Structures are given as C-alpha cells and as structure tokens.
Amino acid sequence: MKAEIIAVGTEILTGQIVNTNAQFLSEKLAEIGVDVYFQTAVGDNEVRLLSLLEIASQRSSLVILTGGLGPTEDDLTKQTLAKFLGKALVFDPQAQEKLDIFFALRPDYARTPNNERQAQIVEGAIPLPNETGLAVGGKLEVDGVTYVVLPGPPSELKPMVLNQLLPKLMTGSKLYSRVLRFFGIGESQLVTILADLIDNQIDPTLAPYAKTGEVTLRLSTKASSQEEANQALDILENQILDCQTFEGISLRDFCYGYGEETSLASIVVEELKRQGKTIAAAESLTAGLFQATVANFSGVSSIFKGGFVTYSLEEKSRMLDIPAKNLEEHGVVSEFTAQKMAEQARSKTQSDFGISLTGVAGPDSLEGHPVGTVFIGLAQEQGTEVIKVNIGGRSRADVRHIAVMHAFNLVRKALLSD
C-alpha cells in the first residue's frame, strides 16, 4: 500500500506551527507495514487542494488528509474532498449526539450553524469518532483509493489514529524494527564496511543514522509475528556484527546496546547497579557534565559517591592534592594529570572507579594542544588506564559531549572485563 499524507492548513506553510502530525503518522503507518511515499502541505485553498487530490489519487492507494475539519469558513477539507469525489456531505448521528451533549452541558455557549459542520462526513465514509474533540473523522474507498480525513490538533488526531484508524488498516504483516547502537566508529566507515549488505538489501533492511558521537543502525522487516521478525532480524544482526573494521576489529566491540532510548550512560549506570560498584569523577573541560549525566538517572545514589569540578590548575591542586609543581611540569592537558585526577577522585571518595577528563574544549588551543585533545583516566583497584582522544572539527559543546561519551565507554569496557 502506497500512502500519502496531505496536511491542510495555511498556518503550516507560514511557519506558525510545525507539522508533527506527519512524523507521527509516518511512524505509526510504518509499524503496520504501510509505506508512506509522499508528504505534502497545502494552504486553506479549495483550488490547490483539489489539484493536489488529483495528483495523489493517481500515485497513492491511501491518501490521508489532516486538518481543516473545524467549524470556521477556512476549514474546508471535507467539503473539498466531497467535491473531488462527486459526493455529498452527510451528518454522522453519533457526532451529532456528541455536539448535543457538548452544548447541553454549556448553556452559555452559542450553538451556531457552522458548529454543525464538525458532525459531517463524506457520503459513504466510515466515521472515525473523535475521543477528545468534536470534529468527526472518516475513511472511505473510491476507485481503489482509500481516503482518510483526520483532525489537525495532535491531541485529537493521535487517539483517532491509534484507536480508530490503525485497526481498520491492519493487514497480515507489520513492520518490526531493531536498533543497534555503535560508539567509536564513524558512519562513513561503518557504511563502507556494510556496503554489500546495504546495496543488496531487500527484506530485512538496514539504515544507518549518525548522531552526535555515535551511529545507530535500524534493522527492519515485515512479518506476521514478532517471532518471525526476530528470526530475520537475528540473522541480519549477526551478519552485521560478524563484520570487521579495516584494522580487523569486530563490529561487536563497537556495538554497545539496543533501542531508541538507550545510551552509553544508561548502560553504565545499570551495570554499576548490577555489579554493586561505585564511581566518582574529577572533571576539568567537561565541568561536571559527566556527573550531571549520571545524576539524570534515578537511584544513582547507590553507585555515585560524588565528584570534583577542577577547572583551573589551582583547584586541581587544592581539591585533589596534586602538587602544583607537577601539574605545571606536565601540563593540565596531559596523561599525567588525567591519571592523578582519576586516582585522587577514587581515593578521596573510596569508590571502586575514579574517572577523569581533562582537555581542550576550544575554541582556542591550550598548552600547544589543538582543540579536541582530551585525556581520560580510569582508576580502579587493578590500576589506572589513560586514553587520549582527538575530537577535532567540532563545536565546543560537541567536544565536551563526545568526551563524556568516551568516558562512559571506558567505564563500560572495564565493567564488562570484570
């Protein structure tokens, strides 16, 4: 089924509102195996909407119109669709009854003739009741094309889609997806490694998405059940993770989790809780961003003892008891400083792990180091590891954000090795 979404409303074209309905509809239709091929916005103009309906009817088998179902003169979606199809508008008894109740409970409200328009549907349409508003939706098929009209306000559209429309559109198969999350490998390298799988995909499919500091892969398949989908997705996932980088490193080493909402931080926090271990941090360039990210999750008092924000050399010396002369000798952006910061954070809080971040966020270089140079230390009972990462060509905010991601990934690897 080829679907098309037409958003009706001049306010969309003038930028007064954002068309979030199209995104919601596309997502929900994809979940039931309906492919959206076109999205269009048109103003409150009958001539232009008629022209668009003519085009849509030739190229799509499902045409969904959103907005323009209200009581005012510029709400003309149903009227225009009826004219296009050569049909009349008729009243839906259930919608009329809802109007009666609405105004009976509000005697101070004037019930004018234009209010009645909200209870009308195109002749022959199946009514789609409005759970949170007054304007009834509708669905009808003419000459092999299914037309759907939905209200514009998201608070009315969403329940109508979820509870009324989708059950009527459901077929034998649905779209099932799985998201793999990768850190430490760029999108271009990942796409190059997976070129054969991407070029030859039919079903299941995979699509890469680059985000700040990480890459996600969405694996999708159409199936009649979750079990059937899992079989296909498991095969594709293993094909992906069995691939290697140009250096011979398995992609399994870069895949840290699954799902839209998962993050490196959430993985680390949950694993610390599971293992009953604690962590503390000492931060310079990130100025507490690592600690703030940890604190975003509930129940972290059991694993997060506290930390230090030591932005200046003087505070690194004073708060962490690192001799100032040593800091001056090695520099604040150095392996030595990262090591000592991590060790002192761990020691002073009696934590299992001490993590440190020191580097150059930009826009200016520091101590001869270019912007994006970051040293990250991780102290634990077995010893201290320091890594150097280069996050060049990024904004100051991105350098700090990605540095924190590297820190979480370092902790994640340590937890997995225990």
Curated annotation (Swiss-Prot):
Source organism per UniProt: Streptococcus pneumoniae (strain JJA)
UniProt record similarity statement: Belongs to the CinA family.
Protein's recorded name: Putative competence-damage inducible protein
InterPro entries per UniProt: CinA (IPR050101), CinA-like_C (IPR036653), CinA_C (IPR008136), CinA_KH (IPR041424), Competence-induced_CinA (IPR008135), MoaB/Mog-like_dom_sf (IPR036425), MoaB/Mog_dom (IPR001453)
Paired cysteines (S-S): none
Entries under NCBIfam families matching the protein: cinA_nterm (TIGR00200), PncC_domain (TIGR00199), PRK00549.1 (NF001813)
Listed Pfam families: CinA, CinA_KH, MoCF_biosynth
Gene3D superfamilies per UniProt: 3.30.70.2860, CinA-like, MoaB/Mog-like domain
